[in-house]
C-alpha cells in the first residue's frame, strides 16, 4: 500500500502519497497583511512624525515637534461597525510640543489626529461597514538601472536611470556621435560634463582625471560649451526653468532642492541599499585585469599587484581591504552645492579585449551610510563611471522584470505614503498659522488642522485603486485576495502601457510569485499571487526559503535560508525532489538544478541550496489542485481561478482527493473561528463557544480566564452568499492554540470544502453534453446536493426634502390592501414573510409640490382644516427576478440618537431577503482542472446510466473535453476518487509530489476495482448495457457563482434613453434586447417586413406609437400605424446642427412636415406603467 496516513486538524485523516518529507511548516498565509500593518503602527507612523518634525515658522522662532502618539479604544467593536455601516477605527492622539525659541517657553499638548482604521485579525479593514482588502503593489525599486538598446543602425547604445522613491529622475544616454548626455527630470538633454561641472569639477582636466581618459568623454567635452561651475549652473537653470532670469544663487538652490534636499528627494532605505549594492566595485572588478596595484592604506601592504586578473577567489581575498578604505579619494571641491567633500573609491583597470592596452577607471560611491536617504555627489559620479565602464564592456545591464529589481509596497507602506501626503499638506497650514497668530497665546491645538490628514486617509481607503471590496465568495477567494500582488495602481503600470515582457513569467518568480494563478483577459500577468512559502523582507523584496547544503560534507542540512531573487542568482539550487540518502547526501552523481535562468544537470558537489518543498513554486489556490503536474498550464490557470468563484453550498463536503492544503487554507482564510490560547472547551452553542484557558507552571496546570468566541450566523457576505459558522468541537475537548473551533462557509471539519464529491461518467448521452455541457441526475436537485443560500440586502432611507420630510408608513396612496398584507403597523415587512418581485418591503411616501389653491379651496381648507396631503408613493419594492423569505429587518432612527446616519436621513431601514437556490439548467459547474460547463439537462434518477450494483451515476461529462485540453489530472482524480470512496478513506496527493500512476492503479486494485478504472454501465431507460466499458469515478465538482437566476431577464415596458428614446440595455437597468444591424439584415432576408417595422418603431423609439399601442392593447382595439422613430429626428437635428437644410420628401417629391412631438401629445395617451423596480439613479425617462 502506497502512502501513509497523516492527521489534518482534529477531525480528518488522509492517506498522503507524498514522498518528500516536509522540512518547513507552511507560514501563516495572511502574514503579508498583518506583519506590514503592525510595522506601520510600531515604526511607520513614528518614522513619518520624525521626518516632518520640527515644523518651523519662516523666521525660525517657533518650532513644532511631534513627540509621541498612541491609539485609543475603537468607538464601536467589529460587529457593531459592520451593523452601523461605520468604519472600524481607533482615535489617534499625538503628543505635540511647541517651542518658542525667543522666550524659551515649551508647551506640550495631546492633539486628536482623527480616527485611524484598524486591521482586523483576519487582515481586512471595515470601511463604512464593508470589509475591504488593501492589495500589495509591485513597483520598480528605487535604484540606478542600466539598459542596453539597439538603435536603428544596429549599434549598441546604453542608457542609465537613477530612480528615487520620490523626487527627480536622472538619466544618462549616448547618441549616434558617441556623446554622453544627461536629462534631469525628463527635461531636454545636456552634455553629461555640464552636470559634473555644476557639482564642482570645474575644469576639463579635473573631469578627465576623475573619469579616466576615453573617446566618449572627449566627444562630450567638445560638445560642452560651458567652461566652469558658474556657467554650468546657469546652463542647467535655463534648461529646468526656461524663461526665468538665471542667477548663480538661484541655480545652486534649484539643483540642491532637486537632488540634495531630504524633503524633496528620497531614496528610502531600500534605494540606498540597492544603490550601494549596484555601485559597489566588486561586480565590475570581477574577471578584470588591474592597471594599478591595490594597497591596504592602513598597513601600506600591496594586496594585489598591477596586472592581476581578479577571479572570484582573488576578489574574496581583497574584499576586506576594498570595503575598509582602499583607494578612497576625498575630493575637496571648490564652490560645491553640497558643502561636504566628495568621497569616492576608484581603481584603474585595463579595457577588456583592447589591443592598445587602454585603461579605464572604475569608481564606486564609497558606500554612504544607510541613514543617507538622499543621493550624494559620489552616487552621481559613480553612476556616470558605471555608464562609461559599460561602454567599455565592464559591468552588467539590468533586467527590470527581475524580482531583484521589483519590490512590494504592502499595506503599511501604502498607508505611510498616504499619511505623508496628509501630513505635508498639514505642514503648510501650520506654517501659515504660525506667522499669522499671536506667538504668546498660541497652542499646538490651534496650529494643527487635522482635516488634510483625515481626508487623505479616507481617500486612500475609500477610493484608491489598491483598496478593494473584499472578494468573499468563499474562504479561498478571501485568502487569495489578501495575498494578491498588483502591478497596477498609483505609481505602477497601466493595462494599456504594460508590454508583453512585464506580464511574462520570469525565472526569478520561482518560489516567489505563482506562475499559474493570474486573471485571464487584459490583466493577465499584471495581477499575481504570492507563492505558498514566500515572505516579504524589510526592503519589500520577496524571499523564498531554501535548505542550506553544507559545502564541506556535501549534505543537505535542515538550516533554512530565505533568499531574495538577486541573492539567489549567485547560487546553484537543487530541486526539492532530488533523492537523498538517510544522512542527507545526494544519491545521484548528477543533480537537476537551477542556476540563474537555466535548468541543467550539475555535479552534486556544486550544489549550494535545495528547494524546501515542491509546492513552493505555486500559490495557495493552485496548490489545492490535485494532479496539477498532469494538467496543461492554461487549464490549471482556469482551475485555480474558478475555485475562487465556487458558491458556498448548504451541505459542503471536503474532497475525497485533496492535496493536503485544504486544512491550512481554511485555517488562515479568516472564515473559521480560531482558538487563541491553549485551553478546555467549557460550553458550545450554535452561536458561541467558551474556552477556559489552561496555564502551565512548574509542571502543574491551572485554570485561567474564560474566552468567549462569537459565531456568525446566516450573515450576508460581500458577494451576497450566506456566511454561517458551525462549531466542530464539543464540551470538554482540550484545544491547542491556533486550532479551528468552528467551520466557516465552504468548510467541513476544518478543511476547505468548495464543492461535493459526485459519481461522474465520461460518456455522451443523446448529444446533451455537446460543447462541454453537463448532464446531471435529478438526485442532486432532490437531495439538495448543490443547493446554496443567497442573501440580498435592500435599504430605504427617509430623508428631509425641500417640501418636507419623507415618511415610512403603511398608509400609501392608491395601493390595494392586499399589497400591504406583509407590512406591520410601521409599514415595514415582517420577518419570515415570503415576498416576490414587485412586493412592497418598506412603505414610504414623499411630499409632492404644493399647487396654488383657488379661493374656494382656501375657504374649504379654512373651515375643515388640513387638506389631503399631496404625497407620492416611493416605497421600496422587491426588484424584478428577486424574492424569497425576509430574514431580518434592521431599523435605524435619528431620534434614538443614532449618529451613524448620514446627514439629512431621519430613518434607515434594511431588509435582508434569503433565497434557497437549487441547481438549475443553465447553472455553471466546474472541476478543479479548468473543466467547466453549463448544465444542459437534468435527467430523472431512473433514466441515468447505472453501475452493475444498481447505483445510478450523478453526472455525465463529454469525453471529448479531455484530449485536446490536456488536463489529464481530472481522469486520475476520477479513478483515485472512486477507489477512496470504496475504501472509505480520504487521500492527499500534493502537487508535484503526489500519487504516480502505480500508486493510482495499486489503490484501485486495493479497492477491488478493475485495473483500467472502467466499468460496464447500463442505460437507465432500456436496461441494456452500453457497447463499451466507461470510465466512471468520483470527481470533486463545484457550483460557480454564474447562476442562471442572476442572468435571466425579461422586459415588457421600462426606462428609455433620454435622447434617442430607445430602451436602455442590460439587466441592471431593466433594459431591452438589442436588435442590431445584423439582426435587421436577417429579418430583411426573410422578407418579414411587418415584424421588422414593429421592432424599429413601437418596440424601440416611436414615442407616440408605443403609447397608442399600449392603449390599443389594453382596450382591445386594432393597433394604429407607426409614426416617425425618434432616432430619425435625432439624425435630422444632428444634420441641422451642422448648418445643413434637411427636408424629408415623399415618393411624389412633396415635403413631409416633421412636427416636433409635444409633451402633451404623449401625455394625452399616457398610461401609468409601474416602474418601482428601477433604481432612482437609473430612471431616465419612462413612457
UniProtKB/Swiss-Prot annotation:
Disulfide bonds: none annotated. Keywords: DNA-directed RNA polymerase, Nucleotidyltransferase, Transcription, Transferase. The keyword Transmembrane helix does not apply. It catalyses: RNA(n) + a ribonucleoside 5'-triphosphate = RNA(n+1) + diphosphate. Its EC number is 2.7.7.6. Residues 1155-1183 are annotated as: Disordered. Signal peptide: none annotated. GO terms for biological process: DNA-templated transcription. It holds the Pfam family RNA_pol_Rpb2_1. It is an enzyme of class 2 (transferase). GO terms for molecular function: DNA binding; DNA-directed RNA polymerase activity; ribonucleoside binding. The keyword Transferase applies. SUPFAM superfamilies: beta and beta-prime subunits of DNA dependent RNA-polymerase (SSF64484). GO terms for cellular component: DNA-directed RNA polymerase complex. Belongs to the RNA polymerase beta chain family. NCBIfam families: PRK00405.1 (NF001616), rpoB (TIGR02013). DNA-dependent RNA polymerase catalyzes the transcription of DNA into RNA using the four ribonucleoside triphosphates as substrates. The RNAP catalytic core consists of 2 alpha, 1 beta, 1 beta' and 1 omega subunit. When a sigma factor is associated with the core the holoenzyme is formed, which can initiate transcription. This is DNA-directed RNA polymerase subunit beta. It comes from Staphylococcus carnosus (strain TM300).
